[in-house]
């Protein structure tokens, strides 16, 4: 759904995906 995501590097896509799936866990991971 986010057209911008596909333009980002893989690690950035994973970063955004983590925030969408588990925001609380993403805060610890990053």
Swiss-Prot record:
Gene Ontology molecular functions: serine-type endopeptidase inhibitor activity
Localization per record: Secreted
Tagged with keyword Transport: no
Tissue and organ distribution: Plasma.
Entry keyword set: Acute phase, Glycoprotein, Protease inhibitor, Secreted, Serine protease inhibitor
GO CC annotations on file: extracellular region
GO BP, sorted A to Z: acute-phase response
PTM: N-glycosylated; contains bi- and triantennary glycans.
Domain observations: The reactive center loop (RCL) extends out from the body of the protein and directs binding to the target protease. The protease cleaves the serpin at the reactive site within the RCL, establishing a covalent linkage between the carboxyl group of the serpin reactive site and the serine hydroxyl of the protease. The resulting inactive serpin-protease complex is highly stable.
Record-stated family: Belongs to the serpin family.
Protein name per its UniProtKB record: Alpha-1-antiproteinase
Lineage: Eukaryota, Metazoa, Chordata, Craniata, Vertebrata
